[in-house]
Amino acid sequence: MKLEVFVPRAAHGDKMGSDLEGAGSSDVPSPLSAAGDDSLGSDGDCAANSPAAGSGAGDLEGGGGERNSSGGPSAQDGPEATDDSRTQASAAGPCAGGVGGGEGARSKPYTRRPKPPYSYIALIAMAIRDSAGGRLTLAEINEYLMGKFPFFRGSYTGWRNSVRHNLSLNDCFVKVLRDPSRPWGKDNYWMLNPNSEYTFADGVFRRRRKRLSHRTTVSASGLRPEEAPPGPAGTPQPAPAARSSPIARSPARQEERSSPASKFSSSFAIDSILSKPFRSRRDGDSALGVQLPWGAAPCPPLRAYPALLPAAPGGALLPLCAYGASEPTLLASRGTEVQPAAPLLLAPLSTAAPAKPFRGPETAGAAHLYCPLRLPTALQAAAACGPGPHLSYPVETLLA
């Protein structure tokens, strides 16, 4: 008779019971193995199919004892297997949750609507101009933009900071305090600066003042020759010179001639030099002669200098040629005749007899300008002696 069958079973860690079971016959079934391995399965199946943590722990303990009795692993492997099963279950849980969260995020993709083709300055100005009182708060400006443009209705809210920054950093917007005692309040009004109308000129909203172009200055200076008002009836209009001359056909040259003072007003500027018509030497001589009219009265007597002739109250006179004018009659009142054929070096005005002129270069038909000349001692002696021989050197050397 085998007594080990009726011995009460000890705990899992009892080594004596396990030895007795190993020493006895293995044909006798254990009372704890009635359910068998078919109902419990492996450790992983036990952890997955257990209805509760407590019941699962009890089953695991029973399974560990059964394995010990059937010659399986020792009782110390039971807690390790339980920990492994719990680790697998906890690892499987986050993975399943992550997969579900990813599917939920993919179901709501972020779609950003196209941004309106205006700057924030333009958008804010449009909102303020469309208002009834010409001023809006920051919240009202945001509501206006959200109602008019779909871009501002999405989940993106960074544009609100852009609106606030543009309001405070640009001079074209002025803050109007709702309560002067609370300047730090956030419910103040914003309106357009009346001194910054250039920013919103022509319906275009600019950040900086528009530069004055050359065409605007030309149109503001006056009408062009083609746009001149018509004359009275029956008066034929002369053809403009710009059509006949090939140089004036270019629009750039016309603009430069029409407004020479827009770039540089000096007479030495390139535009002012090019704007003057070309004149030949003959034309310039005739114009110079016209600009030098002679007076009817003679020149007043000049003050005598010690270096001049001692007897000459007005000193000696040197003719300076000026083309295109008639001979002045400076000595007509004193009865002295002047030869107009050549430049003369006249004697003192007080002498009754005319002095013999000194011959110079032939300038027939030329007029002369008379000015006092400081003569050297040789010429003073020659003039005092009266008529004398011709000088061997030209008069031009005296002017040098």
From Swiss-Prot:
One of its GO terms (biological process) is negative regulation of transcription by RNA polymerase II. It is found in: Nucleus. Residues 32-54, 240-251 have a biased composition (Low complexity). Keywords: DNA-binding, Nucleus, Transcription, Transcription regulation. Residues 1-112, 213-264 are annotated as: Disordered. It comes from the Eukaryota. Residues 55-66, 95-104 have a biased composition (Gly residues). SMART domains: FH (SM00339). CDD domains: FH_FOXQ1-like. Residues 228-239 have a biased composition (Pro residues). Expressed in kidney and stomach. Expression in the outer medulla of the kidney and the transitional epithelium. Expressed in the hair follicle medulla. It is linked to Defects in Foxq1 are the cause of the satin (sa) phenotype and results in a silky coat with high sheen arising from structurally abnormal medulla cells and defects in differentiation of the hair shaft. Plays a role in hair follicle differentiation. This is Forkhead box protein Q1. The lineage of its organism: Eukaryota, Metazoa, Chordata, Craniata, Vertebrata. The gene is Foxq1.
